[in-house]
Amino acid sequence: MQSVLDAGIKKYGRVIADIDTGEIVKLMDSYDMPEDVVYVAGDEKLENTQIHKVMEESIYGGCPVQTGYCNGHNQKLNALEYHRSSEVNIAATDMILLLGSREDVKDDFTYETSKVEGFFVPEGTAIEVYATTLHYAPCGVDGQGFKCVVVLPKGTNLDVVNTHATAEDKLLAASNKWLIAHEDAHIDGAFNGLRGENITV
């Protein structure tokens, strides 16, 4: 297990060290941590914070974003996804990210889970996950739950009409979201392209 503060993260993203995450991390204290995993693409209270404004005006260069959250309990890889844009994660608790490189996805859209690397993310850390990085829901530390703020371009992860223009479309699980699942995760409608162990942390 590496840390996002180590040099190894540079392949997958970067720590955004010069922004204040204190307000939004404190706000996340009031949000539930369910036994399963819950994702909300955009949350009104989170989008009324100063850091949401910083994300739009600075990190995303003036483009509109949505600020939501992913909370719960998870210890498994289950799937990997990617977007056409960076995603910013802000750890509202300590958590672990399991990351891979899109360049390692084969032409048939399969991916060997042995290539996945795990990174510890300390509470309060903001990390930009590059568009070329495979990722999914965080994992908790030592069996504990996690809370994570998720920032993406506005309109990401919404319902999408199925299309069949290119072979990659079979991975399209939501708007701006391409998903490769592990068969053991039993994700309805997903393409089961992860090969090897469904990693547990």
Label each PLM-derived region with a short phrase:
Residues V129:
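Aromatic-residue-lined binding/catalytic grooves and analogous aromatic/hydrophobic interfacial grooves
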